[in-house]
Amino acid sequence: MDLNDTPEQAGYREQVRRWLDGHKAQAPPASGASDDTAYIDARRAWQRRLAEGSLAGITWPKEFGGQGLGPIEQVIANQEIADARVPGILDVIGIGMLGPCLIAHGTDEQKTRHLGPMLHGDEVWCQLFSEPAAGSDLAAVQTRARRDGDGWSLTGQKVWTTNAQFAAYGLLLARTDADVPKHKGLTMFIVPMDAEGVTIRGLRQISGEAEFNEVFFDDVRLSDDMVVGGVGNGWGTALTVLMYERLTIGLGSSGMGYRSDRFAAAVGADPAASRDPDVRRRLGDLATELLAIRFTSYRTLTALQNGQIPGPEAGLAKVTTVNAAVAAGELIADVIGPDALAEDSEWAYLISFLPGLKSAGGT
């Protein structure tokens, strides 16, 4: 496995870098409050700029507005965006996970209606899978969709739903047949988040934000054209989302957007910490872990690039990335102290939010 860019990849990296150099002055801050409407609007506008600059939907087929490139180009773009200290796309869930599901399983009408607005940030999407009694055991979902005339009536609850508070649509897994084995009685639906009967309640985190939500459905009416992948085929459709979810979480972050030299600089700024043997050991462990994550991610990318199905390393990427994030946050908090959680600190997001990704995408 060659870890260097090919000439074509090096050219693509330079193209991305030039675009970012020319546009990053218009970028909003890399992080902000999820309940700040002005910030979310700025992120939508930035995603539109990224799409216009061919930096959104990089792996989507060209016929749906994407670039038709491979996962390696996606990682190159992620790396350059992180190095430029600008935010990436706002709707990672939509473009990284739900859009590919619609491309694979959606009707022509669904693709035409939703993929363009999703790509340009006009429609943000959320994933309506987890329930209070159905997390990693996803097939145990109890949210019910029953036939009601020529449509469906949806009743139930979802939890830990990221971005539901400003999403236009959600992709929801519901039980449509309780008389068959649990994996067979499921159907996937598109749900307008402003539909009558939908209630969204934020879940406050240690960071003070409420990026996760509970979502309640009380006799929500859905038309038959909101079914994705066919009635009773929800489990297979959900597996497509889950595959892209693990890849998005594990590979899309490219080391959480942090490189070991940034942690070394933070430690080096404190003379006492930089001489502390335990701090130096922890920094060395973290640098090794980040390098291992990157190399393991490259193994997955190489398999995908060669048309192969990645092995367990694809799922492990998510787990190891989050574990490294927790270790990194603890190291920075110990070295910098309370100032690391200040509102304008570049480390606040790492320390207070990323540990929550332990639950994201299943455990």
Map each language-model feature to its residues.
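Glycine-rich beta->alpha junctions and the first turn(s) of the following alpha-helix
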Residues: 7, 198-294, 357
